[in-house]
C-alpha cells in the first residue's frame, strides 16, 4: 500500500499526518464537482435575486479604478462583477446572451438558472443521475414554452395607437431608476423606435437611434430630438449661434492646403520666402472657402481640425463651421440630412450637400458646455434621445434603462405576442409542467416537478422584494389561477389591489420570456453534465 503521507509530531509530541500533495489538491470529480458548480451558480443568482421586479434594489459596483456604477440592470451587474469560479463566469455569459438577443430579462434568466440548479442539488442528494435530471428539465422546458404560446395575447403594433407599446415599455422601465417618470421615458422610447422602424421588414436599426446625456437638469427634461446632437460647438465664438435652412458640406478631408504625398522639405531662406508661403496658404484657404460657398453651402462640418487663420477666414466669409466631429456622428449627420460625405475637396458639389431646417448651438446653465443640435432634417429616420440628470451615474443608468425599453419595443415589432408579468406567466407554466409531470411514467417526472418549483422562484422573489410573505402570496396566486382559470394573475408588487396583470398593464414580450426559459435550461443542462475539473499541469493521481 502506497504511503498516504508523512507522520509528524507537534511541539507537545502529539502525532499528526501530513497527507501527500494535500496543499496542491485542487481537482474535483463526480458529485463533489457538481456540488461546487451548483454552489457557485447559486451565489451569483442569490446576489441578483434582490434586484428583481419594480421594488428590486440597486447594486453599487466599484471597478479597479475606483469608478462607481449604481445599477439594477442584470447584465451590467454581472459584467462588472469580479468572479473567479468558471461556472460563475458561465452565469455572466448567460446574462450577456439574454442581453444581446432580447435586451431585457437579464436578471430573471440568472435567478431562474440558479433556482433550477438548487432544485437539481436536492435531486442529486436523492440519488437521481444528473443525465436523468437534465433530460427531465429539457422535457419540462418544452412543455413550458408550448404553454407560453397558448396563454399569449397579441397586441396591435400601430403608429396611430401606441398605447400597448407604451405599456410594455413601462413594465421594463418600472424597475429602473427612471421609474418616477417612466411614462414619459416609455413614450420617448416608443416614438424613437417607430420613427426609425422598417415596418416592411419588421426590423429596427439601432444605429439610427443615438442616446446622448448631459449632467444638469432633471430626468423629466429628457426629450426626443428628430435629428442629431453633436457634443461640439461652432469653431469661432463670433459665428452665428443659429443657422436656418442649413445646406451642409460634410467634409472628411483636412481643411488645409494640399501637401505632397512623398517626403518633402521646404527651404525658407528669407523674409520674402516666408511671406510668399504665408500668402500662398491664405490664398489656398480663401479658394477652398470660395469653393464651399459656390456650391450653395452655408455650414461646413469637418471631421478634422483647421488652424486659427482658417477659422478667422471662415468668420470673415460668413461661413459657420464645426471642427473635430467624430466618425459615427459624421455618418449620422449624413444619414439625417441626406448629404454625402466628401473625402476630397475637389469632389464637393451642390448635389452632395445635406439639408437641415435648423442648426443651433445650445448652452447649459452657468457652465461653458455647449452642444450642436441639427433638426428638421431631410430624412427624419435618424433620432437622438437627449437625457438630462443630476449626476453622471443617473444619466448612465437612464441610458441602460432606455436601451432595455428600446429592445423590448423592437421585439414587439418583430413578434407582437405578449404574456403577462408579475410572475403570472411563470406560475401558469409551473402549473402546466406539474400536470404534465403526473403523466410521465419515468424517473424524469421528479425533474419536471423540480422545474415547476424552480419557475415559482421568480414570483416568490417578486413578492419578497415587495415586502410580502413570499410563500403565502405565492400559494394564494397559484390557487386563484387554478380556480379562476386565469393565467394573467400574478404578484401585486405595487399594491394596487388587484392581482390581474392584464388590468395593471404589466406586459412582457413572449419571445423574451421564451428565451429566458430556453437559455436557463440549456445552461443548467451543460452544468449538470460536467463531472470533472482539470487544470493544466495536474497529475493523474
UniProtKB/Swiss-Prot annotation:
List of residues binding ADP: 53, 105-107, 175, 422, 492, 508, 513
Catalytic activity: ATP + H2O = ADP + phosphate + H(+)
Example GO BP: protein stabilization
Pfam families to which the protein is assigned, alphabetical: Cpn60_TCP1 (PF00118)
Annotated SUPFAM superfamilies: GroEL apical domain-like (SSF52029), GroEL equatorial domain-like (SSF48592), GroEL-intermediate domain like (SSF54849)
EC assignment: 3.6.1.-
Annotated keywords: Acetylation, ATP-binding, Chaperone, Cytoplasm, Cytoskeleton, Hydrolase, Isopeptide bond, Magnesium, Metal-binding, Nucleotide-binding, Phosphoprotein, Ubl conjugation
Residues annotated for ATP binding in this entry: 53, 106-107, 422
Cross-link entry Glycyl lysine isopeptide (Lys-Gly) (interchain with G-Cter in SUMO2), positions: 20, 210, 214, 265, 275, 279, 392
PROSITE patterns found in the cross-reference section: TCP1_1, TCP1_2, TCP1_3
Gene3D superfamilies in the cross-refs: GroEL, GroEL-like equatorial domain, TCP-1-like chaperonin intermediate domain
Record's comment on post-translational modification: Ubiquitinated by the DCX(DCAF12) complex specifically recognizes the diglutamate (Glu-Glu) at the C-terminus, leading to its degradation.
Highest taxon, organism lineage: Eukaryota
UniProt-annotated binding residues for Mg(2+): 104
Location(s), subcellular: Cytoplasm; Cytoplasm, Cytoskeleton, Microtubule organizing center, Centrosome
Subunit (UniProt): Component of the chaperonin-containing T-complex (TRiC), a hexadecamer composed of two identical back-to-back stacked rings enclosing a protein folding chamber. Each ring is made up of eight different subunits: TCP1/CCT1, CCT2, CCT3, CCT4, CCT5, CCT6A/CCT6, CCT7, CCT8. Interacts with PACRG. Interacts with DNAAF4. Interacts with DLEC1. Interacts with SPMAP2.
Protein role: Component of the chaperonin-containing T-complex (TRiC), a molecular chaperone complex that assists the folding of actin, tubulin and other proteins upon ATP hydrolysis. The TRiC complex mediates the folding of WRAP53/TCAB1, thereby regulating telomere maintenance. As part of the TRiC complex may play a role in the assembly of BBSome, a complex involved in ciliogenesis regulating transports vesicles to the cilia.
Name of the featured protein: T-complex protein 1 subunit epsilon
Species name: Pongo abelii (Sumatran orangutan)
